[in-house]
Amino acid sequence: MAIDWDALIAAAQRVRKRAYAPYSRFQVGAALLGKSGRIYVGCNVENASYGLTICAERNAVFSAVAEGEREFVALVVAGKDPQVFPCGACRQVLAEFCDDLPILIVGEDGTQTETSLCELLPHAFRFKENIHKVG
Ligand code: THU
């Protein structure tokens, strides 16, 4: 499938504006392309009990799974800084559903950084391959 990166960037930047981040003031948006061609978005949602905060990337994955999509083609993360890389927890959650995944990081200043899940999380922990297809 050809990846429409512009559409993913626009979706990530749009949802970033909906982020609920009154504590950090650090809004993040994520747009995840499913194998079906659908785009799933997520923003970070913070909480007064700080540890309950959920990142944009995990919200995008969970939204996709709730819609029945478990296979992914690309991810765009839009943040304030030039390089807002997914946190370790989000990398592990992505690895549950992706062997590898091209990831584009987009900063508010327009900086684009290409990376991939395997680059960010080599040797991810998994029980067995493709377990998400049966569960
Ligand atoms: N955050 C994300 O949503 N994604 C990332 O990749 C990094 C961090 C959020 C969590 C928290 O709401 C804020 O950014 C500051 O850490």
Segment roles from a protein language model:
Residues 2-18, 67-135:
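C-terminal binding/interaction regions
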Residues 44-59:
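Compact, glycine-rich, soluble single-domain proteins
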Residues 33-35, 44-45:
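Histidine- and/or cysteine-centered catalytic micro-motif in compact active-site loops
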Residues 59, 63-67:
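Feature captures the catalytic cores and cofactor-binding loops of soluble hydro-lyases/lyases
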Residues 20-23:
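Short Gly/Pro-enriched turn/cap motifs at secondary-structure boundaries
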Residues 38-39, 112:
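Hydrophobic "anchor" residues
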Residues 25-34:
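Short beta-strand scaffold segments in enzyme catalytic cores
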